[in-house]
Amino acid sequence: MDRVKLTGVVLRAVDYGESDRVVTLLTAERGKVSAFARGARASRRRFGGALEPFTLLSAEVRERSGSDLLGLDSVSVVRGFGALRGDLGRIACAGYAAELARELVRDHQPHDELFELLVAYLDALDAGPPRPAALRAFELGALRAAGLMPRLDACARCGAPVGEGPVRFDAGEGGALCAGCAPGVPRTLPLAAGTLAALLRLQDGGLAAAASEPLAPPAGREAREALTAFLEHHLGRRLAARRFLDEIGPLLGA
């Protein structure tokens, strides 16, 4: 079988049998793929520590007859993101970003935008402590890449301008609701004027905008609750990594 080279981030690594490992990668070339690393646990000589989550690597893979899994023949580390691995908060945020990326895309569908966003977010975590604004920017960017962006600049139900806020937010309706539509929707979430403005800046400016966006409480809490609800609505559940962030999140604002 012909071998091809892929550049990807390890989203998940699962032990298989006594000595093997199955890794899920988000790649620049093929989107999300899974690969079988034979003997990865028996000897570190072949793969070293390259198959750990959040590693950016270059991989040589091949198709395997009768299997959806690629065969992983060799890897080299492009970026190990070693600094983020020494801090629980950064690990938790990286784990959440990786799980979110894994759940939002289907196999073998190229997602250049999401791949580049994930690498940029891991770079930010490697460079310094987690910032709530950066995580919100990652969530918004990931939703954009998946075609699921919430409506924030106008009412998600009727399309009327919502102005500068405050507004109500509903995941099922698709985003912000104007004063006329909100009363007819139960259990909406509040978005103060400052929260709405911050989310719009992050939606437009991405991770670059997050560097100058404090997103301090209570805006940080409102933004987190709104995007968490929106993601849960589309994914059908709360991600395991999000639940872990909920446990340690008060220390991070994440």
Swiss-Prot record:
Domain of life: Bacteria
Keyword DNA repair set for record: yes
InterPro entries cross-referenced by the UniProt entry: ARFGAP/RecO, DNA_rep/recomb_RecO_N, NA-bd_OB-fold, RecO, RecO_C
Keyword terms of this UniProt record: DNA damage, DNA recombination, DNA repair
One of the Pfam families matching this protein, by short name: RecO_C
GO BP annotations listed: DNA recombination; double-strand break repair
Record flagged with keyword rRNA-binding: no
GO cellular component: bacterial nucleoid
Function description: Involved in DNA repair and RecF pathway recombination.
Family to which this protein belongs: Belongs to the RecO family.
NCBIfam families tied to this protein: reco
Annotated protein name in UniProt: DNA repair protein RecO
Species, as recorded: Anaeromyxobacter sp. (strain K)
Gene name as annotated: recO
